[in-house]
Regions:
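C-terminal helical "tail/cap" subdomain of flavin- and related membrane-associated enzymes
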Residues: 3-5, 317-398
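Conserved N-terminal helical subregion
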Residues: 2-6, 55-171, 177-189, 241, ...
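Conserved FAD-binding catalytic core of PHBH/FMO-like flavoproteins
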Residues: 128-132, 141-270
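Glycine-rich FAD pyrophosphate-binding loop
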Residues: 25-45
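Conserved N-terminal glycine-rich FAD pyrophosphate-binding loop of Rossmann-like flavoproteins
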Residues: 38-58
Length: 398
């Protein structure tokens, strides 16, 4: 692109920003994506595409490619508390699609970036950042200067820049305290045991332990664990994995014994930032946000990646209307928030209720909702928020 007038400037190229750029490019809009990191970077993100996220991927024309690239189709989940089966559910009872897909977030992002390469109206600028902005008399961002000296004049700016969002903090002056959970979460990759290939299994116990076993690709398995902070530190300090295996054996049943045996050390585990957040305002003037810039959900829901790409789909539709002058930008962004806030609110609040009830079997069983866990977006399922304290994060705008 040689003209500095563009339709949308997206700051951040995680899965949400990449998906938004691709969807807008397919609609013919002129988009520039700015990302501080390199194109090929390791993202320690989610691995689950649930039915709500699969619908976005399918509408974008990417579903067949996802399965060709090793996305693993799954149908069932078992949930245990203190070693006893608490819930079994098949996704066919939650959604007509009847399945979910296991695929690393970075693999999906890489696929989307390859598709963007074929979109003439989308430009990707890696290892680049916003340096300054200029506003017009209506306080809308009129001009953006990048650190490479380029000056862009976008109609809309989007913050898809994660938990520490520059757009949220510096452009919208929203300073929100993200509330971390007291028990850290870690993920490791190991050899695939037959029991993990058979079925996804989630285990929790009355001492605040959590272990989730699932396959990734066709020869590896993921193990996600969470324990109270000091216990987690001690377990990870034994790099041979003996302490962790003994701890897992206290609440993981014999059906996953082979999976425990495959945990040959702790050096492969990496931390996952976890906290809870849902802003009460997703936009202001000609600036909008999506994904982790506006909400954080506990990974026990398995929906972080899904919420980000659902946001991207809804925002792409809203911006398409405004950019075609089918409605005012303010109305389009208000519609985006009206569509996404109730969904994000329900899932963030549901995840918080689950994460804070692990120790209490009866309470955990009462909170666990197969419809929400399976990513149902029906009003009846989302209305379940009434059964637990909603998470809200006021975002006063100047």
């Amino acid at each position: 692109m040689t003209d500095n007038h563009i339709d949308v400037l997206i700051n951040g190229c995680g899965i949400g920003g990449a998906m938004l750029a691709y969807l807008l490019g397919r609609q013919g809009h002129r988009v520039v994506v700015v990302e501080q990191a390199r194109r090929e970077r390791a993202i320690n993100g989610a691995d689950l595409l649930k039915p709500a996220g699969i619908r976005v991927v399918e509408a974008a024309g990417l579903l067949a490619e996802v399965t060709r690239r090793g996305g693993r189709v799954r149908h069932e989940l078992e949930v245990y508390h203190d070693g006893e089966l608490l819930r079994y559910f098949n996704y066919s009872n939650v959604d007509a699609r009847g399945y979910f897909i296991l695929m690393p977030c970075e693999s999906l992002r890489r696929l989307v970036l390859e598709k963007i390469d074929g979109e003439a109206t989308v430009e990707m600028l890696f290892e680049t950042r916003i340096e300054a902005v200029q506003r017009d008399e209506r306080h809308a961002i009129d001009q953006v200067r990048l650190n490479d000296g380029r000056v862009l004049r976008p109609r809309v700016v989007v913050g898809a820049d994660g938990i520490a969002s520059y757009v949220r903090r510096r452009l919208l002056d929203i300073d929100v305290e993200r509330r971390p959970y007291p028990s850290p979460m870690l993920v490791g990759t190991f050899a695939l045991a037959p029991c993990v290939a058979e079925r996804n299994r989630l285990y929790v116990d009355s001492q605040g332990g959590l272990a989730y076993f699932y396959p990734i690709g066709f020869d590896r398995a993921r193990l996600v664990v969470s324990f109270p902070r000091e216990e987690a530190r001690e377990l990870m300090a034994d790099t041979r994995g003996e302490s962790l295996r003994r701890r897992l054996q206290r609440f993981v049943g014999d059906e996953s014994a082979e999976a425990i045996a495959a945990v040959t050390g702790t050096s492969r585990f990496k931390g996952i930032p976890i906290g809870y957040l849902n802003l009460d305002r997703y936009w202001a003037d000609n600036v909008a946000m999506l994904g982790d810039a506006i909400h954080n959900v506990h990974p026990i829901t398995g929906q972080g990646m899904n919420l980000a790409i659902e946001d991207a789909s809804a925002l792409a539709d809203a911006l398409d209307l405004a950019l075609r002058d089918a409605c005012a930008l303010e109305d389009a962004l208000a519609g985006y928030q009206a569509e996404r806030f109730p969904v994000n609110q329900a899932i963030v609040s549901y995840g918080h209720a689950l994460a804070t009830s692990l120790e209490d079997r009866q309470r955990f069983a009462g909170v666990f909702d197969t419809a929400l866990q399976g990513s149902s977006r029906t009003p009846e399922a989302l209305g379940g928020e009434r059964s637990y304290q909603p998470v809200r994060s006021p975002a006063p705008l100047g």
